[in-house]
Amino acid sequence: MFKFYPSDFFHFEFLRVLASAPAGGAETGECLAVLPQVPDGDAEAWYRAWTAQAQQARGLGDEALVSGDTVAASGAYLRASNYFRASEFFLHTRPDDPRLLAAMENSVAVFDKGVDLLDTCTVVRVEIPYEEEKGAARLPGRLYLPRSGAAQTGQGQSEDKLPLLIMTGGFDSTQEELYFFGPAAALPRGYAVLTFEGPGQGICLRRDGLRLRPDWEHVTTKVLDVVESQLAKDYPIDLERVAVVGASLGGYFALRAAADPRVRACVSCDACYDLFDVTRSRMPGWFINGWLSRRLSDGFFNWVVNKLAGWSFQLRWEFGHSMWVYGVESPAEVMRCMQQYHARGYLQKVKCSTFVTGAADTFYFTPKQNTEPIFEALGHVPLQKKRLWIGKGVEGGGLQAKIGAWAVFHQKMFVWLDEQFEIKRGTI
């Protein structure tokens, strides 16, 4: 497979931006202009190059708006939002860096300008009440409603009501990035979509200091409450056709949400089954087992990880980002937090239709360790109501979160969702 960078980490994150181009999240030429400016592993050069590209795209949007070209303006603003998001990504080893919040605020602001100019949908801002031990907060969300009419409906369904996808982010995504992964493909198919930023994600992490939590059903219960008590009363949403969708750690979160009886279908894309086991499998047995048995102290564990992180930028970023989103101070504490992120014993609560995907070529959540155990653990979902797909090759969905193959993923996902919701589309 062709690689833009020698390291898998920088290659994947560059491809993550570039692959959003068909959905409006990037322009190929703008991405290629960034490439020679960023040496492999150089987080500062990455930040500078993507920030400059974001500012340039935002400038193009301003110019288009002055001339009355709202289509060009919307596209430029949406690209700028994704570039601002990408710019700060590799700076997460220093959570106190003020550029993290500044870049995210720019990403959110310019994204709002972009989606408000779209003529394909109506975007409604949503606030989701959320409570945790440290106090109450409001999670930001966006409800996307297609303007071109509802999806074709099956027998017994009201034609003026829309099926709804609730899309959750994961470990390092943002609500704005989710637009390119979900709503951009769902809206033309007649689906309404609700995205939201949860604790430990996007602006909620950087501005509000909310931390990630393993019991994501606590979050999605609040989201579903808002859908049921507010959104379905004000907008044409069909409460009998609600699905949850997530990718990577978001796929794990989607599975947690799917235990709610108000959810009728779940799409879990390339999720983890046990996050600790995934991380454990990447460490020498003597080291991780020695720490688990307490023969090796936290101090020694932290010293070794920090020493190795000095040589490996990816390791430094993974533990740095983890400490930030979990709200802990050391690698050992990260490992303890990860032990809470597993689906073992939980998936028996899921009874709705479920589409489970895996990625054969990922270096994160491999199918053997994650996808297959998830599918097998869905014992209370009838076989005819669950489906398994393992993507292979970059063109066939073989990379994590189906990066580089969203069109293939969307085709399979929406055919399956249409079946679950009895949506009949005409043939040509």
Curated annotation (Swiss-Prot):
Entries under InterPro entries matching the protein: AB_hydrolase_1, AB_hydrolase_fold, FrsA_esterase
One Gene Ontology molecular-function label: hydrolase activity
Disruption outcome: Abolishes the production of acurin A.
Pfam families referenced in this protein's UniProt entry, alphabetically: Abhydrolase_6
EC assignment: 3.7.1.-
Function: Hydrolase; part of the cluster that mediates the biosynthesis of acurin A, a highly reduced polyketide coupled to a serine via a peptide bond. The activities of the highly reducing polyketide synthase acrA and the nonribosomal peptide synthetase acrB are collectively responsible for the synthesis of the acurin A core structure with a heptaketide backbone produced by acrA covalently fused to a L-serine by acrB. After the formation of the PK-NRP hybrid product, it is detached from acrB by reductive release to set up the formation of the lactam ring by aldol condensation.
PANTHER family for the chain: ALPHA_BETA HYDROLASE PSOB, DIENELACTONE HYDROLASE DOMAIN-CONTAINING PROTEIN-RELATED
Protein name: Hydrolase acrC
Native source organism of the sequence: Aspergillus aculeatus (strain ATCC 16872 / CBS 172.66 / WB 5094)
